[in-house]
Amino acid sequence: MQNTTLGQLKATNYKSRSVKEELRENLIKVLRDKKTEFEGIIGYDETVIPELQTAILSRHNILLLGLRGQAKTRIARLMVNLLDEYVPYVAGSEIFDDPLNPISWYAKHEIETKGDETEIAWLHRSERYTEKLATPDVTVADLIGDVDPIKAATLKLTYNDERVIHFGLIPRAHRSIFVINELPDLQARIQVALFNMLQEKDIQIRGFKLRLPLDIQFVFTANPEDYTNRGSIVTPLKDRIESQILTHYPKSIEVSRKITFQEAKLTAAQKENIEADGLVKDLVEQIAFEARKSEYIDQKSGVSARLTISAFENLISTAERRMLISGEKNTFVRLSDLAGIIPAITGKIELVYEGELEGPAHVATTLIGKAVKTLFARYFPDPEKAKKTKTANPYTEITEWFTEGNNVDITDTLTNSQYKKALMLVPSLYDTVKKFHPKLSENQTLLLMEFVLHGLAEYSQLSKNYLNGGFGFSDMFGSLFNAEFDEEEDEDDFR
């Protein structure tokens, strides 16, 4: 990088190469050295990343196709790591011309007049990445460029001179990676202009045709939903994008947990003072899995991985708020804290008509309930099967206590000691947990005691009501009778 003139650069035997060759050769080194070039991308090791590596080795332009929250843009940004750390360019060039292969009038003129004394500068790979979100208002001038009348007047040039062109984002991404997010949102006529650049290597601005063999690695991202809702990718352009790679959501709870743990932004105080058991972490992830197969949610829109990240952050913050209000120095996440993640869920799901009728909050609570029911069978016997077996039902004493008219409210106003006292009121609840999980800490035992109540409610053995900042548990049939009685009273009021 000490070289500052073209002559000095030539003396080092520097060889020019295209950005796609650069990516390919650096990827070959990475693969041979068994290094990781896409750090932080989890769950794609056997699917997306091998296909992406193949596309780079083939020197293809790439389309990443997938639902929202599948790391498409992040993958594109990480491709920068495969570029050389620094590359030389003709100093002063708007489009960072290669000193050994100039394409702009400015660079050619500089080299023609100054020869080996032409000044060169060095461009870091972080500056060789350009990203544009496709929106309906994007114009050809934004992407490709336009004639600049002020420049023409100032330099006293005619519109036939290429120096009057003000280059757009794509020419300025020469020798770089250029990413267009949500490609179908781009108007068809602008997509055609892109196709022309990919195919013919020239640009046309207001009738001015300029041969400009740009060296660009194009990466496009798109959501399959866009093909039917907002727009489509024009066929000639899609045909010129050589590799289409399908992304996907995490295929297991373990992978999903790793992503959430990596992306969730927690403070040092939250990490130190708030304990989150593996059960509640799994529940947060299971909620997303339930959402991805729910009849209330538009599956074409998808359920982003951001849902679990936001939900986990809210879960920790709900526990933190409870801790601060009660004046305690530390706490652990309870299942009742799941009431605090409802805003994170409702903001991340697109409902179909049936879901709109139910309401976002009701759909969110339904998803939480389904997640509890799915995981409950991994920790305890199925309550429905337990009733039919000849062996003693482990839940009989618990349900009978509620049948006698007792109830338990678990809200965010309870301190840790009050929380323990409320759960210990239920006979045999502690013994049931210890029977199946004898080696747990006190906090884990209390968590599973509450989990049993939630699980029995999901299996219709108990009634669960959403309270402000928590849940209330009571007898199933008693709550149904009270609900019917309240309805009769309401009818009497109107007679």
What is each model feature region?
Residues L31, V147, A291, A319-R322, ...:
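Generic structural signal for hydrophobic core residues of well-folded globular domains
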Residues Q2-E254, K265-D282, E295-Q299, F380-R495:
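Conserved ASCE/P-loop NTPase catalytic core
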Residues I75-L78, L83, P99-E110, E225, ...:
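Hydrophobic transmembrane alpha-helix bundles
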Residues F332-K420:
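Extended alpha-helical coiled-coil/bundle linker/stalk regions that scaffold oligomerization
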